[in-house]
From Swiss-Prot:
This is Argininosuccinate lyase. It comes from Saccharophagus degradans (strain 2-40 / ATCC 43961 / DSM 17024). It is found in: Cytoplasm. The lineage of its organism: Bacteria, Pseudomonadati, Pseudomonadota, Gammaproteobacteria, Cellvibrionales. Keywords: Amino-acid biosynthesis, Arginine biosynthesis, Cytoplasm, Lyase. GO terms for cellular component: cytosol. Pathway: Amino-acid biosynthesis; L-arginine biosynthesis; L-arginine from L-ornithine and carbamoyl phosphate: step 3/3. It is an enzyme of class 4 (lyase).
Amino acid sequence: MTMSQEENPVKPWGGRFSEPTDAFVERFTASVTFDQRLYHHDINGSIAHATMLASVGVLSEDEKTAIIDGLEAIRSDIVEGKFDWSISLEDVHMNIEAELTKRIGITGKKLHTGRSRNDQVATDIRLYLRDEIDNIAKELTRLQSGILDLAEREADTIMPGFTHLQTAQPVTFGHHLMAWYEMMTRDYTRLMDCRERLNQSPLGAAALAGTTYPIDREQTAALLGFNHPTRNSLDSVSDRDFAIEFSAFAAILMTHLSRASEELVLWASAQFNFINLPDRFCTGSSIMPQKKNPDVPELVRGKTGRVNGHLISLLTLMKSQPLAYNKDNQEDKEPLFDAIDTVKDCLRAFADMVPAIESKKESMYEAAKRGFSTATDLADYLVRKGIPFRDSHEVVGKAVGYGVETGKDLSEMTLEELQGFSKEIQQDVFDVLTLEGSVAARNHIGGTAPAQVRIAVENAKQELEGRNS
C-alpha cells in the first residue's frame, strides 16, 4: 500500500471553508496511516448501508449494484496492495468513498446518504473488534488446551508451593498449572461478556440525532451480524465502552501471562532448576557463551506494561468528553489496535511454548523437601490427636526451630525427637510427613492431590469442548 498527500484535494466537507487546510494540519489530523486496517469492515458496513438504502427506496437497484461492485473492486485492490491511500483524505472512510466516486461517478456520492462518519467509524470498530475477539478467543483456548496437556502429564510431579516466595506446602506441578488455567478461564468469560455487549449496531445514528431518511436499522444490524441496533443515537456515536472493556480484559489477561512468565523465568533459572525451556524459545548472550536466556516469557512480562498503559490511555481519553462525538476519539484506535496485536502475539508465544516445557522432577522434589513444607501436616496431625490448632501450631513451630538448628527436616527426625515436643506424636506421624502423603491427603475439590488434578483436567477438557461445539 502506498501513501500520498495530494495538493488541495476536494474535501467532502469543503463547502463551508474559504481556504484549503494547512498541510501540517492535514498530516496532524489524518488517521489513515493507522485506521486503514479497518478497510474490510468499512466496506462491509457500506455494503449493508447501501443494501438498506435500496430496500427503502433511497437508492435504485442499479445504484446499489454499482456501489457494491465498486466497493468489492476496491477491496480487492487493497488486499493486493494496489490501493493508493491519501493522507489528504484523512481516514479510511473518505479514502474509500473518494475512490468509489472516482470509479462509478455521481452514484458514489449517494452512498453516504443518511450516514455520518460518526456512526460509520463506531460501526467499523465494533465489527473489527468483534472479529479480533473471536481470533483471540481461539488462541486463548489453544493456550488453555496446552496447559491441560502439560498439567495431565505432571499430575503426580511434586514441587514446593510458595507464599511470599517462601516454601509453604508441597503441591503438584499439575495443580499449579491448573491455577493458570483457572485465571485464563476468567479471562475468557470476560472476553465473551465484552463481545456480547459490543455486538450492537450504531449504524443509522448518523452524526448524533439520527436521520430524516426512512432507514431500517434492524436490517443493517442483521446484515452485519449484530444482535440488534443500539437504542440511543447520542450514545451510539459517543460510546467507546467496548474499547475500554476490551482493554481491561487485555490488561487482566496480560497480568496473568506476566505472572506466569515470572514463574517460568524463575523456574528456568539455575537457582530453581525446575524446568527446561526448549532452545527455540530462548536466546543467548553476545558475550557470555554459557547463557540461555528465557526471552519469550521475559518479553511477555515486559509487554504487559504497554497493554496496561493502553487501558489508562482510553480511560483518560474519554473522561472529559461531552456528548456526542469529538475529534479526541480518533485517539482510541492506536491503543486499541496495539493492545489487540500484543495480546495475540503473547498468546501465540505462550500457546506454542507451554506444551513444550520439560519438568525437572527430581529437582522439584528435592526443593519441596527443603523448607519444612509438611509442617502444616504435622499441625493437622496433632489436631486429630485432640490438641487445639493454636497449641499444635506452637508445638510444630518449636519443632521447626529445632530442625533449623540441627539441619533436619521434620521427616528426618526420629520419633524420640518429635515426641520431645509432644507425647501425642506416634509412629504413624511419618505417614503424613512424606511429600506424597501430604499432597495425597488434600483430596477434595480444588485440592492438590493427583486424583483431584486429573478430575480437574478432565472437567476442563469438557469445558473447552463445549466452547468449540
